[in-house]
Amino acid sequence: MDALYSHFSQVLEQQRKANTRLVVAFSGGVDSRVLLELAHRYAQEHLLPCCAVHVHHGLSHNADQWVQSCAAWCQEKNIPLTVERVQLDLTQGNSIEEEARNARYQALRAHINADDLLLTGQHADDQVETFLLALKRGSGPKGLSSMAQQMPFSQGRLIRPLLDVRRQEIERCAHAIGLNWVEDESNQDTRYDRNFLRQQILPALSERWPSFAASVQRSATLCAEQEALLDELLLPVFEQLFGEDQSLAITLLSQQSELARFKLFRMWLAKLGHPMPTRHQLSLIWQQVALSQADANPILQLSQGQVRRFNQRLYLVADNQDLSAWHAPITLNTPLALPDGLGTIELTLSRGFGQIALPEQSEALWISFNPEGLSAHPAERGHSRKLKKLFQEYQVPSWLRRRTPILMYHQQVVAVAGLFVDRQFIGQDCELFWRK
């Protein structure tokens, strides 16, 4: 245990700060049981606060018992434990393993403050499994980099102190100090890819080549270094391409080689938190969206959004609700909550300082998102035009035209939030505020 603690300490020494708090991701399995012991010892020696978080996925009939066991073990060490209960969304087409992992990290994210270190128990055998799964998917250097030993996470950092340690060494230490731990029965189910590798493939590889895990770790490190070098070399180019509105400049992209474009697309999507698309999808971003006809409105659907084009720039647009049928009355000086995360809108009385004249029947004012068939006459325009044309003139991207609030009086357009007031309603009685 002393040798393992020495290794653990060396990893944490590189990341520890004066205000550091250790947060242990505590499943109760053997890896996290040993990790909790190491973190507790380190926290005591360095006078650091230490706590644990257990994520209850609700997938096993033993899950409640695991919570009780984890609570007892933490109580023995006087370590505060928080239990997070999550529900998995299995409608997105992802595997149970992937959904559980996503939910777990999302739950953990809420517990990490500035300078905190989230400690997780992945080890060298987990790294081999991750590498082989990436290889099976045909991943490039980024995927084959597998798991990083340390990385930014929420407001702090995620640390995997045991990533260089074999599973058998962790189990040997657990037995040596008399630890008990929980056993997840699903770990024996070889229908799951990771369990198949763990039970049937890795033992054969390790028996044939005892240094196989170390070799995989070395390859993963080399892949990570190559990926980091590419990021470093292309970062100045990316910063030129990337706009304040998180879009990419097509004209500058056209000056890059195809390989550089693919990498820049990956950097863009990674920055926006989108899962990596396939190589074919990267090609389609360029061929079907960026290079489509000038008068086209191209759309490429990805797993968590759409790639769109506007004014020679590429945008990643979230999948949104259709708000065409939504409408609601608006009352003076009362914020109106808008649907689908669009904030609030308020028509505020401001006699002598506003931009809108209050009509006689203010109770007939309402908000819509549907510009279909509507016309308006902005004060600065010479004549009335369809809202479709006005949106084009005001440089509103096509996907925002049915997400921009329209203030209506009976069937007349009074104003479009953030754009203009119709000349029939120019006045100083009130102001329209859209708080996104």
From Swiss-Prot:
Organism: Vibrio vulnificus (strain YJ016)
Residues annotated for ATP binding in this entry: S27, G28, G29, V30, D31, S32
Keyword annotations of the record: ATP-binding, Cytoplasm, Ligase, Nucleotide-binding, tRNA processing
The gene coding this protein: tilS
Broad class of enzyme this protein falls into: ligase
GO MF terms, alphabetically ordered: ATP binding; tRNA(Ile)-lysidine synthase activity
Disulfide bonds, paired cysteine numbers: none
Reaction equation(s) it catalyzes: cytidine(34) in tRNA(Ile2) + L-lysine + ATP = lysidine(34) in tRNA(Ile2) + AMP + diphosphate + H(+)
NCBIfam families (alphabetical): lysidine_TilS_C, lysidine_TilS_N
Membrane listed as a keyword: no
UniProt domain comment: The N-terminal region contains the highly conserved SGGXDS motif, predicted to be a P-loop motif involved in ATP binding.
GO cellular component, one term: cytoplasm
Function statement: Ligates lysine onto the cytidine present at position 34 of the AUA codon-specific tRNA(Ile) that contains the anticodon CAU, in an ATP-dependent manner. Cytidine is converted to lysidine, thus changing the amino acid specificity of the tRNA from methionine to isoleucine.
Protein name: tRNA(Ile)-lysidine synthase
